[in-house]
Amino acid sequence: KIIWRCNDKYKHEPHCQTPHVTEEEIRVRFVEAFNRLLGMKEQVIADCRIARETLRDCSSLEREIADLRKEQQRVAELARIAILEHVSVAEDGVNTLQEEYLAKHDSLAQQIIRLEAECRRRVEKCDLIAKFIRTLAKQETVIDVFDEKLFMAVVKHITIGRDGSTGFHMINGTML
């Protein structure tokens, strides 16, 4: 008999008070939750398609990245000029200016990395939702027994309340 408990049960004092649940209880509750999801199938799929369109459109992020790259090039050129001037005129103020330009350049690079990561995250989420849509769309009838492949394809994670209630967080953001 497999029993599941809170991932953080013993992490803090007092210990987590959520009850243990058996794998069989989770399986039965998933079948019920998935069948409720099927009752909303058309609306859920329509909502998922809208979400995918929104996620897929990274044009504003791409414009922001392009603007940051231009600014980065401008700052790099200013740093280069400051370095050349520093060679011909040894002044402490020029060295500080170089450092400011380099710090600004590094800051812009970090912003670009963050925005590119956000674009990738959105594309990955879009792909997951597409898989979720395909899985839900091909499910014609309610399920009577637990299907592990189906479970893995649609569930992101599960929460168990202190009262023993179960929340299935689906990949598309729906919570049942």
Task: Please provide the spans of the model-predicted regions.
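Amphipathic alpha-helical coiled-coil/heptad-repeat segments
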Residues: 1-176
